[in-house]
Amino acid sequence: MKRDLLLTKIEEYKNIMPWYVLDYYQSKLSVPYSFTTLYEYLKEYKRFFEWLIDSDLSKAARIADVDLTTLEHLSKKDMEAFILYLRERPSLNTYSTKKGVSQTTINRTLSALSSLYKYLTEEVENEHGEPYFYRNVMKKVATKKKRETLAARAENIKQKLFLGDETMAFLDYVDKEYEHKLSNRAKASFRKNKERDLAIIALLLASGIRLSEAVNLDLKDVNLNMMLVEVTRKGGKRDSVNVAAFAKPHLEAYLSVRKDRYQAEKQDVAFFLTAYRGLPNRIDASSIEKMVGKYSESFKIRVTPHKLRHTLATRLYDTTKSQVLVSHQLGHASTQVTDLYTHIVNDEQKNALDKL
């Protein structure tokens, strides 16, 4: 979703929310939570409050009037009834006969509610320095996570990684071959953003930064002499991330055309720009997702920017055999998250041995 549209949607949801949700929104914006995350959470709150009113658990006539005491006194059975409602209600997709929503969606809903309840019962302060209330019913609600071994996850994901020579082959494909498959009109559009697109893909493959971190990069955050980028990690922590040397020519090529191509002025501090109605704007996450999907599908298989992050992590572990180094590169506090890459690399080594 385009940033302007996203912010418009957020304002629409804020206009119907209770005051304490607006407090929550302001607090999380300062962390900072991404606008995308806050938008998804506001959608979940709307669905939850509508259910409270429809189920007569709140006497409010509208969402904005659902009071704190309603949330404070909800029982574990009430929350379980809401989960059952999610599981069994007709799908909102007109073309689907499936009932309910996926477990992933339910988990996202519960995550949003858990975040709100934690804020109301632990983080916020009233005029006496105390939370609004203390009873957190969400701590009693169990979530069901998708069960999948690391080996199974590694098997599913490795086909969507550009390992070995495929990393450079993918960049070369976008640089030299992709446009030959396009119409003349499509070629013009491709050439307009070619340097930028290659710079984005190269940076993701060479650093493993998250999509949101790439979107939020400013010019001051990129040091091509040191091959470092400064990013804001989850939780609002700033971090310096090393970038592999192969990305440098692509980043330099983009910077050489950035000002003239996108009509960038001094106030346009975003590193990656897009032109909208002739004006420079920070590129948004959905545009990068579509761009990466388009190029990767033409090359081999459609992947997301997050798979490019996995690609970097797997290649780095394959070279160093250090989970600590990989976890630092990705911005993880623990090496547990990097266990996946050991399984992928071990599978690749086994496949190589089988070919001897």
Curated annotation (Swiss-Prot):
FtsK is required for recombination. It is found in: Cytoplasm. Pfam families: Phage_int_SAM_1, Phage_integrase. Keywords: Cell cycle, Cell division, Chromosome partition, Cytoplasm, DNA integration, DNA recombination, DNA-binding. The keyword Protease does not apply. GO terms for biological process: cell division; chromosome segregation; DNA recombination. One of its GO terms (cellular component) is cytoplasm. Its main location: cytoplasm. The active site is at R210, K234, H306, R309, H332, Y341 (o-(3'-phospho-dna)-tyrosine intermediate). SUPFAM superfamilies: DNA breaking-rejoining enzymes. InterPro entries: CB, DNA_brk_join_enz, Integrase-like_cat_sf, Integrase_catalytic, Integrase_recombinase_N, Integrase_SAM-like_N, Recomb_XerS, Tyrosine_recombinase_XerCD. Residues 169-354 form the Tyr recombinase domain. Residues 16-121 form the Core-binding (CB) domain. NCBIfam families: PRK05084.1 (NF003462). PANTHER family: PHAGE INTEGRASE-RELATED, TYROSINE RECOMBINASE XERC. Site-specific tyrosine recombinase, which acts by catalyzing the cutting and rejoining of the recombining DNA molecules. Essential to convert dimers of the bacterial chromosome into monomers to permit their segregation at cell division. Belongs to the 'phage' integrase family. XerS subfamily. This is Tyrosine recombinase XerS. It comes from Streptococcus equi subsp. zooepidemicus (strain H70). The gene is xerS.
